[in-house]
Amino acid sequence: MMKANVKECPGADRIEGYGMNLLDPTAQFPDGKHFDIIWMSQFLDCFSPEQIESILTRAAQIMDGDSRLCIMETFWDRQRFETSAMCLTLTSVYFTAIANGDSKMYHSSDMDEIVRRSGLEVEVIHDGIGYGHSIMVCRKNR
């Protein structure tokens, strides 16, 4: 689906996908070349902090000094309106209690801590993407 969606976009020849079981801690990201961007959009919130750390640690292993890892999520503390934050925290209760027991909408400082434990650091956070998303841009620790 990703390939079909970007087929006509400028730079489509530079966009690659790689299928893998991210929850398998032995599954390695593709190695042996430079990656400008590793894009993780709205799925890390489906996992526990330990699972996220495993995913990000393995991603960090293939990054170089010029690579960036972008995490797009709806961090409840970075919402423009208090009602938006409340809706996200209530959604978090649903996911944690009913859906799978791991999912939750993270506070950005909690994700920042997981990022740091993974060998990365947050370079910048872009807020106000769409209706309430933020993009956390990460790089390898110096």
Which residues make up each language-model segment?
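Alpha-helical subdomain
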Residues: 1-142
